[in-house]
Swiss-Prot record:
Thermal dependence of activity, per record: Enzymatic activity increases 12-fold in response to a change in temperature from 25 to 65 degrees Celsius. Displays a half life of 43 hours at 55 degrees Celsius.
Family, as annotated: Belongs to the GTP cyclohydrolase I family. QueF type 1 subfamily.
Protein purpose: Catalyzes the NADPH-dependent reduction of 7-cyano-7-deazaguanine (preQ0) to 7-aminomethyl-7-deazaguanine (preQ1), a late step in the queuosine pathway. Is highly specific for its natural substrate preQ0, since it cannot use various aliphatic, aromatic and heterocyclic nitriles, although it can reduce the substrate analog 5-cyanopyrrolo[2,3-d]pyrimidin-4-one with lesser efficiency.
Name of the protein in its database record: NADPH-dependent 7-cyano-7-deazaguanine reductase
Organism: Geobacillus kaustophilus (strain HTA426)
Alphabetical keyword list: Cytoplasm, NADP, Oxidoreductase, Queuosine biosynthesis
Main location: cytoplasm
NCBIfam families in the record: QueF-II
GO function term, MF aspect, one: preQ1 synthase activity
Biological or metabolic pathway of the protein: tRNA modification; tRNA-queuosine biosynthesis
Description of activity control: Is totally inhibited by 4-aminobenzylcyanide in vitro.
């Protein structure tokens, strides 16, 4: 199979060495997608994003997390540099942890329309408590909807210890 043609890459405006600008304001329009060349098979794409930061909506104090994003693409995949810049745009965004992971998932569903997606935020403890919100979604009316229900019900049967953060 040949590599990607220039025509396939024309809509990826953020990739490459072109003087990247970082947005400190939440901006879902930063997300870019490209065609999935393997739509005939199910496979997972997983992103581990250990440098996520956002602000507490009440105190303005910074919150830090590793965000895990896993999805089964359909026709589109998210481009990783655009995802990095998008996640960086949460830097001055004030929202609760639970809101952040749901916003991330909703924005990715909107641009990619995946078969299945899950987002798990593992936030560093503040005030002696860590918050690890998990959300997922499977395309309604398909096996992925059932998969989402199963994974939600079984996602944290063996919780990790927090001493690894």
């Amino acid at each position: 199979m040949a590599g990607r043609k220039e025509e396939e890459l024309k809509d990826l405006t953020l990739l490459g060495n072109q003087g990247t600008t970082y947005s400190f304001t939440y901006n879902p329009n930063l997300l870019e997608v490209f065609d999935n060349k393997h739509p005939d098979r199910d496979y997972f794409v997983k992103f581990n994003c250990p440098e996520f930061t956002t602000l507490c909506p009440k105190t303005g104090q910074p919150d830090f997390a590793t965000i895990y994003i896993s999805y089964i693409p359909d026709k589109k995949c998210v481009e990783s540099k655009s995802l990095k810049l998008y996640l960086f745009s949460f830097r001055n965004h004030g929202d609760f942890h639970e809101d952040c992971v749901n916003i991330i998932m909703n924005d990715l569903i909107k641009v990619m329309e995946p078969r299945y997606i899950e987002v798990w935020g593992k936030f560093t403890p503040r005030g002696g408590i860590s918050i690890d919100p998990y959300c997922n979604w499977g395309r309604p009316g398909t096996k992925y909807e059932k998969m989402a229900e199963y994974r939600l019900l079984n996602h944290d049967l063996y919780p990790e210890k927090v001493d690894n953060r």
